[in-house]
Amino acid sequence: MWHLDEVFVKIRGERHYLWRAVDQDGDVVDVYLQARRNAEAAKRFFRRLLRSHGTSPRKIVTDKLGSYGVARRALMPETIHSNDRYANNRAELSHQPTRARERGMRRFSSPEQAQRFLSAHAVVYNLFNLQRHLASAAFYRLRRARTFKHWNEAVAA
């Protein structure tokens, strides 16, 4: 199951849309920055998701933007689409770390720079997003230690 959402980001005074897909565990599947928020933009985002994963999800959860329905019917007709109120909170909340990073960087300077940063940030976020509420303290500490070990190996390489 994927939770999909889009949010606007201003880059040099122009409005761009950051499309984000989050899985049922809260891990970021993909982020994609586009200038538009129409059906064609949604189809591009869906094609990108399908290319990276190879299969379509059983269900997608979105807000009530009509572009999602058009893209789903065209590219993933067998996938169930839910756009119930509050069902998309997982994707809505996944924008918060991005907004914090955006403020820290004093906004993005170009769409290309924003896409590079957001793609890398999603990978790092998934690595350190350990779902603490699902584990005991001892297991959480073990997973965190393993995560930092992998991070140190990746950074040292």
Give, region by region, the residue ranges found by the protein language model.
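Residue-level recognition of single "structural anchor" positions
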Residues: 1-157
